[in-house]
Amino acid sequence: VNNNDKEQTAVQYCEKHYPAMMDEYKKLMWEQYETFCKKQRNYGPTNISVGTSLETPDDIKLSLTGLWFRINDKVQRLKQLVVLGQPGEVGESVQDTFQDLSVYALIAQIVQNGKWGKK
């Protein structure tokens, strides 16, 4: 890393040195955001809040536990597809599974930060 690179932000550095990778990252993040918004429009926030207001530590723990189960389901799915090389019968691709994992991880952070379902 030269001195000019050290003066750049991490974003500037990555966009300069890895433009194709950064463009792909932003494209995937946008696709995930659009999918997230469509699902929110269809289901609303109660599927994650599990019928609670997410105001107590127990409410948040319940929601995060539910998300843990969903994430674990996806990890098990990846194990079948990638590690064991067994195609599934439900037609969920590796790409779809990675996308779901990414979105669930972000949802968990939103819940933990106290912003889930807030206007």
Please place each PLM-identified region on the residue numbering.
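Intrinsically disordered, low-complexity regulatory regions
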Residues: V1-K119
